[in-house]
UniProtKB/Swiss-Prot annotation:
Annotated stretches, region: Interaction with NCK2 third SH3 domain (major): 1820-1836
UniProt domain C2 DOCK-type: residue ranges: 425-609
UniProt feature, compositional bias: Pro residues: 1825-1851
Basic and acidic residues biased stretches: 1680-1694, 1705-1716
Family, per entry: Belongs to the DOCK family.
Name the record gives this protein: Dedicator of cytokinesis protein 1
Region (Phosphoinositide-binding): 1687-1695
Location in or out of the cell: Cytoplasm; Membrane
Compositional bias of kind Low complexity: 1639-1664, 1756-1766
PROSITE patterns hit by this protein: C2_DOCK, DOCKER, SH3
One Gene Ontology term, aspect cellular component: cytoplasm
Amino acid sequence: MTRWVPTKREEKYGVAFYNYDARGADELSLQIGDTVHILETYEGWYRGYTLRKKSKKGIFPASYIHLKEAIVEGKGQHETVIPGDLPLIQEVTTTLREWSTIWRQLYVQDNREMFRSVRHMIYDLIEWRSQILSGTLPQDELKELKKKVTAKIDYGNRILDLDLVVRDEDGNILDPELTSTISLFRAHEVASKQVEERLQEEKSQKQNMDINRQAKFAATPSLALFVNLKNVVCKIGEDAEVLMSLYDPMESKFISENYLVRWSSSGLPKDIDRLHNLRAVFTDLGSKDLKREKISFVCQIVRVGRMELRDSNTRKLTSGLRRPFGVAVMDVTDIINGKVDDEDKQHFIPFQAVAGENDFLQTVINKVIAAKEVNHKGQGLWVTLKLLPGDIHQIRKEFPHLVDRTTAVARKTGFPEIIMPGDVRNDIYVTLVQGDFDKGSKTTAKNVEVTVSVYDEDGKRLEHVIFPGAGDEAISEYKSVIYYQVKQPRWFETLKVAIPIEDVNRSHLRFTFRHRSSQDSKDKSEKIFALAFVKLMRYDGTTLRDGEHDLIVYKAEAKKLEDAATYLSLPSTKGELEEKGHSATGKGMQSLGSCTISKDSFQISTLVCSTKLTQNVDLLGLLKWRSNTNLLQQNLRQLMKVDGGEVVKFLQDTLDALFNIMMENSESETFDTLVFDALVFIIGLIADRKFQHFNPVLETYIKKHFSATLAYTKLTKVLRTYVASAEKPGVNEQLYKAIKALEYIFKFIVRSRVLFNQLYENKGEADFVESLLQLFRSINDMMSSLSELTVRVKGAALKYLPTIVNDVKLVFDPKELSKMFTEFILNVPAGLLTVQKLSCLIEIVHSDLFTQHDCREILLPMMTDQLKYHLERQEELEACCQLLSNILEVLYRKDVGPTQRHVQIIMETLLRTVNRTVISMGRDSELIGNFVACMTAILRQMEDYHYAHLIKTFGKMRTDVVDFLMETFIMFKNLIGKNVYPFDWVIMNTMQNKVFLRAINQYADMLNKRFLDQANFELQLWNNYFHLAVAFLTQESLQLENFSSAKRAKILNKYGDMRRQIGFEIRDMWYNLGQHKIKFIPEMVGPILEMTLIPETELRKATLPIFFDMMQCEFHSTRSFQMFENEIITKLDHEVEGGRGDEQYKVLFDKILLEHCRKHKYLAKTGETFVKLVVRLMERLLDYRTIMHDENKDNRMSCTVNVLNFYKEIEREEMYIRYLYKLCDLHKECDNYTEAAYTLLLHAKLLKWSEDVCAAHLTQRDGFQATTQGQLKEQLYQEIIHYFDKGKMWEEAIALGKELAEQYETEMFDYEQLSELLKKQAQFYENIVKVIRPKPDYFAVGYYGQGFPSFLRGKVFIYRGKEYERREDFEARLLTQFPNAEKMKTTSPPGDDIKTSPGQYIQCFTVKPKLDLPPRFHRPVSEQIVSFYRVNEVQRFEYSRPIRKGEKNPDNEFANMWIERTIYTTAYKLPGILRWFEVKSVFMVEISPLENAIETMQLTNDKISSMVQQHLDDPGLPINPLSMLLNGIVDPAVMGGFANYEKAFFTDRYLQEHPEAHGQIEKLKDLIAWQIPFLAEGIRIHGDKVTEALRPFHERMEACFKQLKEKVEKQYGVRTMPSGLDDRRGSRPRSMVRSFTMPSSSRPLSVASVSSFSSDSTPSRPGSDGFALEPLLPKKMHSRSQDKLDKDDPDKEKKDKKKEKRNSKHQEIFDKEFKPADSSLQQSEAVILSETISPLRPQRPKSQVINVIGNERRFSVSPASPSSQQTPPPVTPRAKLSFSIQPSLELNGMMGMDVADVPPPLPLKGNMADYGNLMENQDMMVSPTSPPPPPPQRQQPPPLPSKTPPPPPPKTTRKQTSVDSGIVQ
């Protein structure tokens, strides 16, 4: 038989690629993407578990799994699989899983914005993950992508409030175990800052991007402007040159080279290949350019063709002339400043044409800049622009998509701010400025064209050395723009001349001038008419000076002018001419040789950008020092005045010169100081930011080119001389510069010595060492000087001396150097230069010196002493912290030799100081995190040996140890309670916890060893220990159950559950206390309780017995455990409410403590009682907590009452009051003012009218300012009366008012308050009589099924409805609270199947309150007074339903109609502190048909009497309800009137069968007889008030009544009305003592309805226009008459629509479900709840008018106009309706509405709690949802294996067991 076999190594790990639904208990469901650990395999099936839920193992088809590589570790039980993916891929995968869960939650919460953000991030990560997995990316792109991925993960984690991930520089997650604490802290800081910056960018993308970009660009030394020319829209008509450049409008000068594009006449670039690739980058922009007030991007368009465009005969015209056409200008200041950035935006730059010949291009540019707008007529350029950071090399690397090899590079004219060493240039920028040319023999001014070319001294032209613009080829001669007939043209055209360096000294620029004619024939004959030139090298060997040059214009024959020999010997500028003694301003021509100086003038300006040629004579003199040694001293001094840019260009040559001077004068000291100063000057230059990139050049020079072997002696000597003379005023400044250059001076000294040693094998070693020692001693002596002059130098020494360490130790003993440094620091005068001193120490720690063990031995004690000194004085904390951090960082390293002793030094000197610094620091200090990291690092680096040694360091002073431990415990507790690090720094916090845990355990050992015995016991110390340990254990960051499973697994894997570790330690420490335990009771009960409540089972089991131990301790001491009991009850309440504790804790508490108690001789009984008490309390508290955040306030109230009743029962007054106020607040939120008043009354009852002082717990609220119980009681009464008033419970308010009035009158004598109170009471009495109060309905609700919480399950409650709340609304409200509950259809008690089912079943029906009148009202009293007690102060409620007994009588159905009446008694009267109370007893009675008839008759009589009384009291009442009532009774058409009773009960047969009923029959007859006088009075009143329109109706009624009266008086005798009925106050006859509902209540009294018979009758509709009595008819008749009405009513359809709007959707469904076809009354015996519980009144009473219709005397109902507010409720009288014969009038408590009532006004709606009905969008809740969209088409699932596998193997063999329990990380 085949069986399951363990999988091979390559089959251990896989991913599900299709969903699989388990089909049996053994199978495992899979979702796409689930990773599985596969343990066994069998013919196409696998067995294992998903990594999501490792606890559930099962089988699944192998075809659904894609196997992946994984590393398998361990075997059998300990087998784990680790995916073989890249770490980053694993991180992305886990991140996606974590985010997807949150993403789903965001969807559920409808957080759309965040949902979309997360979706984008998830898509990005999935995309990038695929790219990385594809393995196709080149290394640099992969590196970039990794950066993007990690940045996205970190950003996403932050916005989702997940943990911060810390990484190394390569983006890999840091392993905290291998990283020092300080590095970890710094990594967190960096990560946090980066994420914060990203968040800021995202938050206000535009604004912050501007700021960040500006900051980024400001920090970049070099910038470039990228320009992409998209199109030139200009009507030129000929070829053109488009010249683009940057321009400074303030200085009116161009600041960059031109970018030149040649444009053809066809409107396209001449080089068609570059059609969509016209890109240029303007480089070398720097910070100075950012500071320019304005920068413009200028485009000049030069037409190349004819002189005049309008000339049409092109063949005869000269072509190829450069003519000005126009300009386009755009302000790019914001782009260059980084304020605007949009590389995709195309900018349109409007074109301005040249207006006339005198309109020079430069002038037009300035005009356009000054103008507000340009009339461009649609002409202009389209460009995109973007600012890029970096020089050209960086840009090409970082923006290859923008800048490639084809992109033109236009440099800045001049050097960039930072000259890069490899940037070799030899560019001369020549600008043609202007000229002034005489017209000569011509009648008009000439059309002058200047041609520029470069010639050597032999007259040979240099080819291709002129560059008109970037993006264009080099040319040999440049022709200027021609201005037509302009005498003084101004060109401002710049070109670049680039000549090989060797040709410069032989070359000159030549400018020739020629008149150009527009006619081709004339033009050819025009020769050069003049010439100007300028040499590029001056006579002294320097290059042409920058700036303007006024050139001499020579005239001669054209041929002569072409010969260089003719003019080269002549002066080229007017300045030279003057030097030679000639006048440069002569008006006439002067002849020089064969050339004549013309009076024409011509100016150019030049700018030399050369790294090889200098314009500086002094520098040249130094470089060529051998040619004239006499000037050497002067040259050396002058060097220091030369511009830095010139020096760095010739750095190597200059240094060579200096050291050559030094070496060639080795015997004398003449030049030593000067050379030293020059060297210092050069080193100082390179330190400047502008030349910082020359540092590598200097380093390279020292390493490779420097060769002065004896320089060290001279340099050391000069430096020592300077230091020794530090206090001399003249020397001080030079010494300061020298010390700033110390690093490189020592590099030269050391390199020189090393070279010397290589040549002479360590010769003169001792002398060299001695000279260095003397130098260091001089420096140290200088440090101790107190002179003011030396302060700046000493500061510089502290800053720069550490820079020499790494070089000096190559040629000098490091230990000696360490001693020197120690002395150096110790010599700094106290209180001076503290920051500089600490910075110096920081640099020393960074140096190689500190990594050497021997050197550290010397340096560390000095450093720790310095730190201690400054920390104790709270000086320069930031520097101290940085220094300590760096020291600890070095000591953590494994490559720095032994560190144990050094950690000890730090511990001894600094641990306590650092602790105290942390304690004294505010949480808001920026440094608190750094110091805590330092303290954690010290503790982490301490070994057990260190802890043991720590105590010894305190010596014999016991108090020192106590103080130290006290400080530490308090500090730890504070840090744990209020962590200094953000919550998302999980790794840092966990590392800190791990370190603290070890330290706490180490300190606990000290407690046990030194402070436990009787003599040395320290109570406070132990107390602090326990509080700290519990605080540690209960801190948020250790509660693993709150984390995701992945995070929990990671923490457990790396650190274990630290709560367990410390919990067991606390337990052991407690038991160690022995006889001292009693000192900790009750103080330690709370902390121990906190610990036991942690949801960790093993910890609970281990620590719960401590409670029994505490009980035992207290019992042995006091023979009771009262203190313990009080404390645990108080604390338990706070803890459970705060979220701790669960069902399991309750069970464990019960089990463990009972076990212990039962074993104890004395505690068995009392202990058990206590345990049961706590368990009961816990049940209630857990219920309360579960429901506390529930939207359902009713449940919250129930639980609150359960808890407060429990506290009352166990006499915990303080807790009882606390929960009273919670209940009161809930009531106020719901506007339940009556209940709020009753709740507060419970508090008031606890107080006496006395001067006793209030206990603290009695004044629970800030609102009550009372010192005595009497004061507090008075304040409470005032508030309660206020609430009763708001709840319209004036009777209750009056009762309290009387009690309070007595106090005011007889005790307090506060007549002012008494008067106010009595006024209120008077108002209350008036309200009782005059204000109509809506009467609430009462509903019985049963909760059945195990799905309900314990406080509801299996119980029945009576609910008091809200004002105007119908049963449907109440039911809907109930079902929204329990959406999963099923509504029961019957009112009969449910069976056990329902009670024990796991679901939820709700039974709800209306009950009638049973009146319980106070004794004082058992006499005739006004109905307005009595009506209050019908629905208030009630404790018993009844529900009636009809049942049949005996045979059915088709002629008279009343004879065997019995009523089953159920009486419910609640725990308390309603209303009370809740709007519902539990039913405590249920009693059922059956009422015979005869008794039912008596009740019905009695009610009818009461009804008539009441209405008559009301009309007597208030003659203004409307007559319609009275009409309906009387007509319904007297009209003989009603089914024979009370003839049904006569048929049923007044027969001989009935008397024979029921002889005992004789008295009841007589009573019924008496009631029938009594009806006549009431009716007579009613008809009399009706006759008085009837209108003429209704007179016929009244007369018919009178006729009917006459017949009725005759019959009744004949059969049953005559009754006369008591005389009291006329009394306006309305005293009532005895028969009316059973009072009836006020009509205003809109609610009936009896509790069953005839409709209960039939299962088909429809419940009354919420908006029904019919009168409320209507449903009391048997259904069949009702329906028919209704149908008839419907036919007669043409507006019915409209009305129905209105009704629909008012109806709740819920009711519509209800109606549909229970509305089958009409059927007979007898159809069904089953009682359907929907029938028995219909609330027979409209949602809001709606007034209607009655119209008489023809002779039929039938009444229809028409809707009232909105103004008819005072008309009575709707009424539909029918001929068939009668009160007297309905046997079931009191069934279901739904007696017809008292028609005479005017309904009370609806209350103002304060909040949603006012109405119980659903909100308006209820339609959405039940409307049928649209069908879901079809699922996306996917491929078919993989085929399942044909064989069904056997069940998984039983765990028999060891092998199988081991396979089973594999674990996956």
